[in-house]
Amino acid sequence: MTQQTFLVEIGTEELPPKALRSLAESFAANFTAELDNANLSHGEVSWYAAPRRLAVKVANLSAAQADREVEKRGPAIAQAFDAEGKPSKAAEGWARGCGITVDQAERLVTDKGEWLLYRAHVKGQPAQLLLAGMVNTALSKLPIPKLMRWGDKETQFVRPVHTVTLLLGTEVIPGTVLGINSDRVIRGHRFMGEAEFTIDSADQYPQILLERGKVIADYELRKSIIKRDAEQAAQQIGGVADLSESLLEEVASLVEWPVVLTAKFEEKFLAVPAEALVYTMKGDQKYFPVYDTAGHLMPHFIFVANIESKDPQQIISGNEKVVRPRLADAEFFFKTDRKKRLEDNLPRLETVLFQQQLGTLRDKTDRIQALAGWVAAQIGADVNHATRAGLLSKCDLMTNMVFEFTDTQGVMGMHYARHDGEAEDVAVALNEQYQPRFAGDDLPSNPVACALAIADKMDTLAGIFGIGQHPKGDKDPFALRRAALGVLRIIVEKNLSLDLQTLTEEAVRLYGSKLTNAKVVDDVIEFMLGRFRAWYQDEGHSVDTIQAVLARRPTKPADFDARVKAVTYFRTLDAAAALAAANKRVSNILAKSTDTLNDHVHASILKEPAELKLATHLVVLRDQLEPVFAAGQYKEALVELAALRETVDEFFESVMVMAEDDAVRVNRLTLLSKLRELFLQVADISLLQ
């Protein structure tokens, strides 16, 4: 069957840069799924994305679906005809659905009976008839939170669409996509190359766009060019460019023909904290800052133009003029803010609402101050420094710098606290209170910072859950999922001895009578345990391992971590599967039993050698493991418990648990409950699959 290259390009106005990659990848994935669902064989599927286009190219696409044989079994003959041999309604309905009459149906005869049968040879449809519809379906499934209309059209898309190119080999596939009839016309760069030209063959893409349109459609190529040229530009001035992945992606999504240039700013601005300068360079202007080999910010920046200019110095000068007022603003704010102490901003926090039912930022500050001190006492941090950090924690939100450059919250608090002569761990805590901000982010570096970060996040969790505003679906306006995971990461990775039960109770207590949810403590803990599940799945632990530990509801995060790792190791042992099955059997036996168990096993009632052996083994292990459990050495405990495999197997092979004699039966059930209790001190391994 003939195979050809297929190309679809959607020409648009400027697409959202932060969404460009996801749009392109989703388009390719959706279209591939459509091809596979339609049984159209194909080779490699490539995606292309630039500010004004999304494209997918498919190699070796079959010209038509393969023919296929269809079989549909109908009602059994007994139900297909009545006593007089007339077709039943069920048979007629089935036949109608197949496009035949009952008389035209074949018979399927097996050892189990006889049925009506429809067989047909279905000829595959040409790809030309299917592709436009498949493109429309793939586009309709893109992750676009907000669609827009343009002109007088009813069509909706992320941005207005101007061209649609659908080519199978050299032929245009007729069809309408997003209100535009397909053609072979594509658009080039706005200011370079040909504004508009025709493409003869799908195989010419994306090379023809590069040569005639001056557009690099290959997203990864464009990104790699920017990275390479920016690194070289930084080296030429003796520095290292800050090529953060997120900004690199965004800049690659803003330009069609990247040209990397280097500019500078006045050295006097380096007196301003680097974070503020970097914020305006990266956040506002999409520039790459440059650092020297010691990690200090240099008075240079690298930017990417979207055009090859005959006079690049003009572009450089223009960008230097644009950034100077922003840096001057930062300098002014920094000087102005330092004219008063950070603590002097406390009264102004009363004018800012944290949440209508939960009070102002000043109220939140008081709670954080108290909770940070409480946490510090639990983890051995300096209580006075923790409460001081709590008091100052939100003061920088009232400064000019943070008001103008919002992403500098925390870090400016640190700089202003240092200027005021605060203790260093207090100053650092003000910066690190929001950590970790995202998956993989650094954790607070000192105990005071840990106490403040935990207090800030727990106050938010307790408050928002306390008024019943739980996260729903993908809506989480107070970032409670991030806060919960942040608390858990700090406690686990810093190995802090904190219990979620008492921690949550203290956070709730500090709200007084403001909270309306009577189950707030349980709700917060369950929510946080749910975050544990997601976190440990991402770490590679199996779902049933996590469920086995969650069944014990351990509220100490560090303890939870030790249990999960212990069970994961236990599963590698030869005895694991047999003991998990035995625990499941014991669990089922105990669940079905209506007998009241004894407090302990009565040795005098034990008769069978296998039950005597198990009882003795359990007594020995219980005494050995008591200090092991107390120390939280769960891995070592499970290794010891694995030695029970042979004894447990012998018990089930030779002992009738549900004996007729009541005393014997209850004693054996009690023995099994003691076996299960030992394992339950780590996890419910009966849940392991």
Curated annotation (Swiss-Prot):
Instruction: Report the SUPFAM superfamilies cross-referenced here.
Output: HD-domain/PDEase-like (SSF109604)
One GO CC term of this entry? cytosol
Report the InterPro entries cross-referenced here. DALR_anticod-bd, Gly-tRNA-synth_bsu, Gly-tRNA-synth_heterodimer
Q: Which UniProt keywords apply?
A: Aminoacyl-tRNA synthetase, ATP-binding, Cytoplasm, Ligase, Nucleotide-binding, Protein biosynthesis
The places in or outside the cell where this protein is found are:
Cytoplasm
One GO MF annotation is:
arginine-tRNA ligase activity
What Enzyme Commission number(s) does the record list for this chain? 6.1.1.14
Q: Which domain of life is it from?
A: Bacteria
Which reaction does this chain catalyze? Answer: tRNA(Gly) + glycine + ATP = glycyl-tRNA(Gly) + AMP + diphosphate
Q: Which intervals of the chain form a coiled coil?
A: none
One Pfam family per UniProt: tRNA_synt_2f
Name a single GO biological process: glycyl-tRNA aminoacylation
Asked whether the UniProt record includes Metal-binding among its keywords, one would answer no
Q: How does it assemble?
A: Tetramer of two alpha and two beta subunits.
User: What family is reported?
Assistant: Belongs to the class-II aminoacyl-tRNA synthetase family.
Name of the protein in question? Glycine--tRNA ligase beta subunit
This chain's source organism reads: Yersinia pestis
Gene name linked to the record: glyS
